[in-house]
Amino acid sequence: MVRGKVQMRRIENPVHRQVTFCKRRGGLLKKARELSVLCDADVGVIIFSSQGKLHELATNGNMHNLVERYQSNVAGGQMEPGALQRQQVAEQGIFLLREEIDLLQRGLRSTYGGGAGEMTLDKLHALEKGLELWIYQIRTTKMQMMQQEIQFLRNKEGILKEANEMLQEKVKEQQKLYMSLLDLHSQQPTQPMTYGNRFFSI
């Protein structure tokens, strides 16, 4: 039986997507190590998860040295100057991102497990700025959510107020109708009832 072609598309379920990412990432890194060992090749792999977490592999040395080798090989005219400049900017961004991730990870470890004494003064200042930014973003998001909740309650209050006014108008209309019926009944003339020769008025 011929197996049908599997269509590659994004996994919608976040749990299944994360499990598949971990499995495929492990398989990719394993293949990269095997290629390096079997063929004596220098292999570098850089992966960013959907949450922005960095995963990397440099089989010989470190990723920074491998990137420098790559840049030195392509800088000899194989790439256009603009493309090379964009690549350098991207590499610099990756390097800064790695530094920021490392700094924040150290800050989290220091917050929950001690060890802040191992950080330098500059890194502590940078961590403080990062935490202040986080707190500002959290407070901003919190204020936005509170404003949305207040607006929702105001809208709900307005709807209830309108419904109450409509009910009051209906009650007034019913009262007017009832009073009109009473007036109409009171204005009707009394009709005498006879029993033999006697008259009784009602």
Curated annotation (Swiss-Prot):
It comes from the Eukaryota. It is found in: Nucleus. Its main location: nucleus. Residues 87-177 form the K-box domain. The keyword DNA-binding applies. One of its GO terms (molecular function) is DNA-binding transcription factor activity, RNA polymerase II-specific. GO terms for cellular component: nucleus. Gene3D superfamilies: Transcription factor, MADS-box (3.40.1810.10). Keywords: DNA-binding, Nucleus, Transcription, Transcription regulation. One of its GO terms (biological process) is root development. The keyword Transcription regulation applies. Pfam families: K-box, SRF-TF. CDD domains: MADS_MEF2_like (cd00265). Expressed in seedling roots. Residues 1-61 form the MADS-box domain. Probable transcription factor. This is MADS-box transcription factor 33. It comes from Oryza sativa subsp. japonica (Rice).
